[in-house]
Swiss-Prot record:
Keywords: Ribonucleoprotein, Ribosomal protein, RNA-binding, rRNA-binding
Protein name according to UniProt: Small ribosomal subunit protein bTHX
Organism per entry: Thermus thermophilus (strain ATCC 27634 / DSM 579 / HB8)
Lineage per the UniProt record: Bacteria, Thermotogati, Deinococcota, Deinococci, Thermales
Assembly and binders: Part of the 30S ribosomal subunit.
Job of this protein: Binds at the top of the head of the 30S subunit. It stabilizes a number of different RNA elements and thus is important for subunit structure.
Length: 27
């Protein structure tokens, strides 16, 4: 699990992207 891993939540935050592991809306 690295910073640039787009399949992890931390990777999403580092890359500034969203997806299954990092939804835009807060539940």
């Amino acid at each position: 699990m690295g910073k640039g891993d787009r399949r992890t939540r931390r990777g999403k935050i580092w890359r500034g992207t969203y997806g299954k592991y990092r939804p835009r809306k807060k539940k």
